[in-house]
């Protein structure tokens, strides 16, 4: 009887996937006794929030992700329905080492874990060069306590805490081959009761070399007497999600692939988190690597069969789930939410919007929102001791790409101190393209510049320059399908003229490409110059179509 029910559910799940519009009602009625008539489409967040971890506290869901060397670090997102999210804060405002006062691509905060324990929110994260850190807070929006170094180590990554029923605390983590010399191992340690110290040398609870190479990002849970570890394997681009279970926390652990790409277009469904709603439904949020767009987030239904999770839909009957493109929304008390990810900024507040991050630990003297009402003033500073190209600047203010296709418009007024000062709009990954306002004698000019392989210290190339009659200009970047970008400018905000050529945005080190604004000068120079930005407006294709 149970098998028959499961077969019927899967049958209607398949029908649901064929046409998420026409057959929605049929599928929903078959899949759930709840009167929900809403669906969602993946990705739920088309933005670079890699290595997500998610928890539920009451009716609220909270999500965190990797942030590497950007600051503030460890973004904290909030949702009431697992589909609509907004940023509410950051768990690590400044990274706790001076090396992060300058950009350190690919280093910093890797794969943090979020848990709620004893009335507090706990975040553990690994820095592959420094060790395992912990921060905690009473409120997920902050303030968060300063990072505590739990274990100084090299190559320890992706930590996740777990408190067992008897109160004993544990920490599981993976290994970075680039630092430790090996990977594909999951190691479990006992933790002190305050969560601040590792108490033993650790036990290898799973070796994935033969069956699940590059296993990493473990997340620890307990259900129905089993200890579960959810962990991706096989690599970011083409891997799969592995499920491990054991009746003993130290193992041995059985293993099973619980989510794979299969016949879908969702490559390498990677690291994520299992969540259970108040109604007892199980869901899984994971990332998909999408090149220049970074690691975008998907939401999958979870079905438990014989105490194994089946994530997504088993379309081919091989017992392994495949990602869904669309599905009915989770059965929660707030199926419809006004939450949306922050993007545009009119700079009318006394603080920057939470969507902004700097490329390194930031200094208050880099900017102000109070010098001119309704404007963000970026000062022409350059904290980098050496600056081969704009990629060396820590003081570029950036956002993640918010959608597959979007337009960014900003207006700046440039007030240089010397010919060395510059300000503008940039799209940056391992390569960058920028529109830069500069000053030469009595003339202002706007240039289009590109630079490739910025980490190798290459110089940028200026391919086109136009004169400006005044130091005020509107700048625009259009990002199209496939992250192909074009730039344009306007002197009146109405008529835009193209400048430069088509630019193919590319990913950075472990991150997607980003859009940003900047003001800078040459290294070591003291400048009193600045640029005032009136607004930063983003329009996605969905928003444009609604007009």
Predicted regions and their residues:
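Bacterial N-terminal signal peptides
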Residues: 15-29
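Compositionally biased regions
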Residues: 5, 30-33
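Carbohydrate-active catalytic/glycan-binding domains of CAZyme proteins
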Residues: 33-547
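Charged interaction patches that mediate protein-protein contacts
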Residues: 1, 21, 452-453
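N-terminal secretory signal peptides that target proteins for export/translocation
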Residues: 1-12
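Intrinsic structural disorder/low-complexity segments
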Residues: 9-10, 16, 32
């Amino acid at each position: 009887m149970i098998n028959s029910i499961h077969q019927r559910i899967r049958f209607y799940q398949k029908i649901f996937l064929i046409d998420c519009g026409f057959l929605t009602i049929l599928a929903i009625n078959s899949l759930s006794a709840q009167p929900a008539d809403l669906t969602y489409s993946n990705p739920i967040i088309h933005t670079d929030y890699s290595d997500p971890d998610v928890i539920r506290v009451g009716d609220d869901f909270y999500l965190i992700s990797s942030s590497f060397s950007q600051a503030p670090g460890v973004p904290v997102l909030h949702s009431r329905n697992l589909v609509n999210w907004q940023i509410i804060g950051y768990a690590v405002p400044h990274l706790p080492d001076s090396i992060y006062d300058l950009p350190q691509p690919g280093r910093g905060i890797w794969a943090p874990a979020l848990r709620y324990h004893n009335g507090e929110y706990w975040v553990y994260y690994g820095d592959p060069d420094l060790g395992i850190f912990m921060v905690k807070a009473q409120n997920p929006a902050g303030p968060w306590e300063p990072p505590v170094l739990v274990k100084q180590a090299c190559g320890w990554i992706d930590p996740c805490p777990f408190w067992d029923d008897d109160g004993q605390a544990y920490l599981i983590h993976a290994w970075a081959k680039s630092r430790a010399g090996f990977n594909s191992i999951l190691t479990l340690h006992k933790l002190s009761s305050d969560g601040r110290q590792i108490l033993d040398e650790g036990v290898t609870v799973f070796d994935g070399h033969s069956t699940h190479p590059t296993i990493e990002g473990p997340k620890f849970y307990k259900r129905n007497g089993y200890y579960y570890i959810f962990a991706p394997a096989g690599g970011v681009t083409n891997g799969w999600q592995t499920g491990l279970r054991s009746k003993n926390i130290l193992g041995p652990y059985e293993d099973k692939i619980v989510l794979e790409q299969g016949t879908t277009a969702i490559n390498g469904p990677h690291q994520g988190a299992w969540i259970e709603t108040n109604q007892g439904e199980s869901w899984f949020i994971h990332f998909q690597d999408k090149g220049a767009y970074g690691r975008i987030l998907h939401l999958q239904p979870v079905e438990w069969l014989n105490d194994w999770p089946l994530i997504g839909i088993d379309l081919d009957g091989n017992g392994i789930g495949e990602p869904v493109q669309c599905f009915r929304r989770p059965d929660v008390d707030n199926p419809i939410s006004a939450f949306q990810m922050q993007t545009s900024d009119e700079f009318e507040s006394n603080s920057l919007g939470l969507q902004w991050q700097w490329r390194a630990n930031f200094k208050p003297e880099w900017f102000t929102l109070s010098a001119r009402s309704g404007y963000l003033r970026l000062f022409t500073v350059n904290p980098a001791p050496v600056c081969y190209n704009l990629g060396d600047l820590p003081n570029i203010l950036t956002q993640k790409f918010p959608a597959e296709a979007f337009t960014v418009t900003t207006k700046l007024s440039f007030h240089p101190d010397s010919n060395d000062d510059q300000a503008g709009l940039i799209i940056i990954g391992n390569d960058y393209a920028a529109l830069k306002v500069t000053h030469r004698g009595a003339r202002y000019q706007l240039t289009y510049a590109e630079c490739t392989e910025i980490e190798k210290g290459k110089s940028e190339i200026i391919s086109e320059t136009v004169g400006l009659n005044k130091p005020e200009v509107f700048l625009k970047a259009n990002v199209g399908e496939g992250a192909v970008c074009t730039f344009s400018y306007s002197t009146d905000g109405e008529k835009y003229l193209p400048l430069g050529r088509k630019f193919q945005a590319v990913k950075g080190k472990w991150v997607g490409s980003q859009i940003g604004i900047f003001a800078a000068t040459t290294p070591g120079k003291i400048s009193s110059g600045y640029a005032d930005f009136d607004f930063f407006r983003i329009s996605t294709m969905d928003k444009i179509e609604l007009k």
